[in-house]
Amino acid sequence: YDAKKMVIWPISSGLLMVLLSVGIYYWDWHFKIGILSGNIWVYMLLSIAGTVLTQVALDNISKYFRSGMLKDRFNLENESFEQSTECVSNPYSVNIPMRFYYQGKFRHGWINIINPFRGTWVVGTPGSGKTFSVIEPYIRQHSSKGFSMVVYDYKFPTLATKLYYHYRKNKEQKKIPEGCKFRIINFVNVEYSCRVNPIQQKYIGNLAAAQETAETLIESLQKGQKGSGGGSDQFFQTSATNFLAACIYFFVNYGKKPYDEYGHELDAEYSEDPETHHKRLTGRVYAKGCLGQMDKLVEPAYWKGQYSDMPHVLSFLNHSYEEIFEVLVTDPEVYPLLGPFKTAFDNKAMEQLEGMIGTLRVQTSRLATKEAYWVFSGDDFDLKVSDPKNPSYLLIANDPEMESIIGALNALILNRLVTRVNSGQGKNVPVSIIVDELPTLYFHKIDRLIGTARSNKVAVTLGFQELPQLEADYGKVGKDKIITTVGNVISGSARSKDTLDWLSGDIFGKVVQLKKGITIDRDRTSINLNENMDSLVPASKISDMASGWICGQTARDFTVTKTGKNDSMNIQEAEEFKTSKFFCKTNFNMDEIKAEEEDYKNYPLPIYYNFKSTDAKERILYNNFNRIDQEVKDMIKKIQTEFGKSEKKESSPTKKQ
C-alpha cells in the first residue's frame, strides 16, 4: 500500500482541479465551441477529472481500512513484547540464545538465568523440547563454569553420555574443579555403577536423621501420598517410619568403630555396664595399637558401624518379630521408639502389629534385590559432591521398567546427598542438581532445599510434563510448595488447564493493549481506539507452541535504583522495571551440537566393575546377597547369646523404673 501514489497525489490533484475549474468558470475566454464558451468546456473537464481523482483517493483510504480488518486475527501484534537482546553473564548464569517477534521483526535475544540458585523448573508435554532447550544447556554451561554436577537420568544413558562428554572435555580444558571424579549410580547395569553407602554415621549422625531417612524411603515407595487416607493412615505411616528409623539407627551404631580421615581404623575405649554387661563407649579414641596411652588420644574423622548399610537393614526386616525385638531392645537409644510395637508384641496383638509395620515389611521387601545389595554394600565415594577437597559429578540412573523400585532407592541417596551439599557455610564448590522427569523420583522436601541452599551455592533444576502429573505423585501440598518456591519458570507447549491457567494468569498476567474498532456505512467510516487490560500470553497461545518454542519468566536479582534530578525517573526506560518474561524460539548452533553428538562415541561411559562375564556377575551378586543375609543371622545369634531374655528385661527403661 503506497499512500503517496494512492491517496496523497490523487486527492491533491483532484482538489486542485476542482478549485481551478471554479476559477475558470468565471473567466470569459471570448470564444465558443458549439453553443458553450471555451472556459465552460474546460470547467466541465477539470471538475469531472478532479471529482474522479478525489473519489479514487477516498476509495483508496476506505480500502486501506477495510484491508486492515482481520489482518491480525490472532492478536499477535498486541501479544508481542520487547525482550532481552543482551547476554548478561556471570560465573553461575545460564544464557540461552533465542529469537523473538516484536514490531514486525524476528529479533535475536537471550534468556538470561542470572541466578540459578533460586531454582528452575521446566514444564512441557513430551516432545515440546524442554530437555533440548533447557536441561542440556544447563549441563553444558554449568559444567564449563566449574560446577560439580548431580544429574538424574530417567532413561539411562540419554543424559549420562552428555554429562560424561562434558566432564571429559572440560577436564581436558581444566574448567572443572581440581580432583573432580565422575560417578554413576545404576541399579540395573551394576558394572556401570559405583557403590555407595548412605546409611552410615557421617550421613546419619542422630536419631532425627534416621527418621528423616526412613520417612524419605516410605514416602517414595508410596509416591509421596503422605497421610492421604486420613488420621488412621497417618498413624500407621508414622508407626512404620518410627520402626524403620529404629532399625536404621541400630545398624548405624552397632559395632561402630572410629576411623581417621584416610580411612585407617583407630582404637576406641569401652567400659562394661555392670547391669547389662553391654560394652559402652567412653568417648576416648586412641591411635591404632595405642589403647590406654593418654598421649595417643586422637579425634576420629568419622565412625562406621559394623553392618551399617541398607542391605543389612532390609535383610533384618525379613526376620521374625521376636528376633527383631530381641535385637533392637539392646540399644537404649532406639528403645523409646519401640514402645508401642513391643507392647503390641508382648500382648500378642499381632493384627495391630501387622497394621503398624506389616505394610513396611511388604514394601521394603521389594527393594531387597541382589543389585541393590551390591550397590549399597560398598562405599566408593562421599555423597558431598560439592566438597572442595573431593568434588565429583554424580549421574543417578533409572529404568522405566523398574521405575518405582529404583526411584525409591535413588530417593534414599538423594536425600542424604542434599543434606551434605546444603552445608559448609558457603565454602563449597557450586553444585547443579538437575532432575528431569521429576515425578519418577521422590525428591523429599525439595522446597526446603531450594529455599535454604542459595548460600551454599546449590542450583536445582526440575523438569516435568504437567502440574496434574506432579500433583498425582507429590500431592497437592507438595506440588504447591515446589511451584511457588522456584524463581525461574520455563514452559514449552502444555495442555492441562491447570498448567495453562497458572502460566497465563499468574506468570504472564495482563498488560494494556490497544484495540482498534472500525465502522463503515454509506455515510461515513468511523474508527474507535480503546486501551484495555488483556492477557499478555493467553493459554491458547501456550498450548499451540511448536517444539523449540518456550516461554516463562526469570528471577530478578537486586539492582540499585537509578534516578535523575530531583529523583525523577522514566519508568518505561528504567532497567529495573524492564520485564524478565520471554516468549521465544531457542536459537542454538545446530552444527556445533551435531558435531558434539557425533563425538560422543569417542567418550564411552566408564565401567567401574568388570565382572568378565554375565555368569560371573550373577555369581558375585548372589554371593554378596547371601553373605549379607548370613551376617544378619550371625549377628542375631550373637546378640541372643550375649543378652538373655531376663537380662533384656532388666535393661529396659520400664524395668529400671
Q: Where are the predicted features?
A:
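Short, flexible active-site loops
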Residues: 15-17, 396, 433, 486
